[in-house]
Amino acid sequence: MAKRDYYEVLGVSRGASADELKKAYRTKAKELHPDRNADNPQAEAQFKEVNEAYDVLRDADKKAAYDRYGHAAFEGGMGGGGGARGAYGQQADFASAFSDVFEDLFGDFMGGRGGAARSRAQRGSDLRYNLRVTLDEAYRGVQKTINVPASVACDSCKGTGAEGGAEPVTCPTCSGMGKVRAQQGFFTVERTCPTCNGMGQIVKNPCKSCHGAGRVEKERTLSVNIPAGVETGTRIRLAGEGEAGMRGGPSGDLYIFIEVREHALFQRDGVHLFCRVPVSITAAALGGEVEVPTIDGGSSRVKIPAGSQTGKQMRLRGKGMPALRGGGAGDMLIELAVETPVNLTARQKELLREFEKLSEDNNPEGKSFFSKVKGFWDGMTG
């Protein structure tokens, strides 16, 4: 049966770059690997074909010869003493030629002989704890007590997993390597040892308290210092307070993620605070003062300029939130909301009507608006 064109095998054009060739090879190799196609007898042959094509096209000299002579470049008779396999005989060591690709695809695949398991001790996992605080607590800083369920080192075996504190022994399945090898057609594949789970050691007499795990589940009570200035999304790291390590390995870390609750009066934007303050129509028109609360528990008197409109903002410097890492505090912005009176008495209504008759020149924005409306309609009808 005639060999297929190598470019066709990889599904690329003849002008494909080295990166495009490698990407195409990785895709094909992953798709056709015997481990993933145990029920497809043709996959192994196709897998070999893909490897053969890539072995040629990845090498600049072989590729040049193939582009010029085709498959004949690798068969007997093409000058230069290539022997029965031709000038570029297919005797490459695929284990070394493709190790960089397969390590990406399948993990520790096609490696050398290696040694014992890299580390019998394993670091514990990191933990996440979501903690809600009030805006007042975020302003002042606070000490919080939290309960964290986590795996901790077993007291009975001191984390070894063995009864009576005995030492683990070398795994008989992998001889301490943590991996086992299996032949898959054309290749030798390494997998994590199923007996010791890659640890390289086993426990002959498991601890009765932790069943050989070396860890037990336990709820711990921790005290956490929340600094002033935290905001939603702030992350606090507590080193060594995560899951306990395996076989004497170090513990992971605990990460506290802060969520600041909404406040009834203040809205926050970084270090600045906003407060919407209602004022009477007379105070807005004539001017006056209003007392506003501040986040520190006090209050400040703010002057309202005569003629203030809804939305007017005034700033109280330094009355916002403290910066988390120092640098002073933000500001507090006060936004006026002019209230329209409701439930008017007959006398109040009478006074307002009288006021309206006298206030034609006192509403500049309204006058300007209606002038624009008139101009708009005149333009439509003219």
From Swiss-Prot:
Q: Which residues form the J domain?
A: 5-70
Name the UniProt key words of this record, in alphabetical order: Chaperone, Cytoplasm, DNA replication, Metal-binding, Repeat, Stress response, Zinc, Zinc-finger
How cofactor binds (record note)?
Binds 2 Zn(2+) ions per monomer.
Q: Is Cytoplasm there in the keyword field?
A: yes
MF term (GO), any: zinc ion binding
The record comments on the domains as follows:
The J domain is necessary and sufficient to stimulate DnaK ATPase activity. Zinc center 1 plays an important role in the autonomous, DnaK-independent chaperone activity of DnaJ. Zinc center 2 is essential for interaction with DnaK and for DnaJ activity.
What this chain does, per the record? Participates actively in the response to hyperosmotic and heat shock by preventing the aggregation of stress-denatured proteins and by disaggregating proteins, also in an autonomous, DnaK-independent fashion. Unfolded proteins bind initially to DnaJ; upon interaction with the DnaJ-bound protein, DnaK hydrolyzes its bound ATP, resulting in the formation of a stable complex. GrpE releases ADP from DnaK; ATP binding to DnaK triggers the release of the substrate protein, thus completing the reaction cycle.
Protein family: Belongs to the DnaJ family.
Q: What is this protein called?
A: Chaperone protein DnaJ
Q: Which organism is it from?
A: Cereibacter sphaeroides (strain ATCC 17025 / ATH 2.4.3)
Gene giving rise to this polypeptide: dnaJ
